[in-house]
Amino acid sequence: VIAGGTDVASARFLSPRQARDLPRARIACYPSSTIGTRYPDPFHLGSHSYGFNPWEHNGIVYTCRGGHIDISHLRKACDWTAYLAWHIRQALLSDKATFSYRMREPSKHYLQFEYPQGWASLPPDVRERIAADIAIQVAAYCTYMGMVWHEILTWFGYKAVAFYTEYPSAFSWEDVYSNLLGCRLAVEALRDPDRDFDEALTARIDEELQRLGVQPKPAAWQAGQAVRGQWFVGDFLFCDIVKRNFDIGWDDGFVTPWIVPGTGGCSDASPAIYAVPSLSALREYGFSVKYEIEPREWERKEILSILYPPGRGQTRRIEPAQHFGAIMQYVRAQAIHRYGTYVDDPTLPSPVAPQLAVVKPAGTETAVAQSPVATGASLGMQSQAAREETRSGRYGYEGVEPASGGAGRGQKLTTNDVLTFAYFWLGEEP
């Protein structure tokens, strides 16, 4: 039986021309107060653009309820959600059983669909509506998991650019929350019946930052400086994040941002806790989707060895809902070995950093349970009290490769990528 669901008949997807191109590259930066970190005016971030736009500003901003937010990460998550939503909708309307794609790493992502009985006989307008709703939900889920996968890869040493490792910033304290926020805002923008994706997203980013209590430009640097020697050490090429945020929502389906206490203008505001995307809502339509990742990076051997016996896992796939928990436990154990027991606790000093003032608790308590990522939690903001009620314990360089049901072609830099890198090196931000 096919029933229910949000009416998304008027949803505004990317245009076919936009969807031909991969989401463009954007330069991210550390949240730390180090050389190279860009701080845009959070009240004038410019218009979001799926394609190249010299008036779009990115960098680190600080919010009272969301802590540091990387606008580049947020925008990338938005664009990947929109890109995947367009292609997944096309696959569903073509009755394809499988769909595959690549993000910004060699890994290949697979989706396997099971359709409900009677799907082929539904009126075209009903199929369109259901396909649109499912595509948006699945795209947000896959984008979020793909972004987490990128953090996992960089933790194990993956380099998107030769000789430049992203390990120092893997699971830095703002990464996951920024990605999650982007997925959420993309869902809302895609469902906007009156504006195209770029226009709707421009408005939603500004509105959400205001709701999170975004602070003037200097506050982002000041908040980073406040945790120098506690959450990070060093500077520029020698910066190391000694506090890592491994909260991907595996324990309870929610992600809590790290808040820097005492930041001017915030008055000890409580963190805005968000639910991670899930696939649970597909059941109301009678659909099911299996999502897998096939690692193709050099680092795959070590990652797969966590899940499979030696010599047996080199061609295996990873199912995030089933395997990310074990991988994250392994990553956390490595982090504890390298940085100390409290590596993921922002309230206590790191033993490998200078012993400065201790950052006080700010609602970032941690608790180990089966992941609701598998069982599902709907997109939505929850209060601290609501989250406590659900807690039961603690705890994405390339192109899109065509395959069965796949989209895109080749591993290459797009014109948008070249323009983005050139503009950055010419000086995007003052």
Q: Which residues are covered by each model-predicted region?
A:
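Divalent metal-coordination and catalytic microenvironments
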Residues: 151, 175, 181
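A subset of signal/propeptide-processing and intrinsically disordered low-complexity segments
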Residues: 2, 146, 170, 390-393, ...
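Bulky hydrophobic segments
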Residues: 2-168, 187-362, 367-369, 379, ...
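A glycine-rich, coil/turn loop motif that links secondary-structure elements
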Residues: 168-174
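Long, low-complexity repeat tracts used as extracellular stalks/passenger repeats
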Residues: 358-429
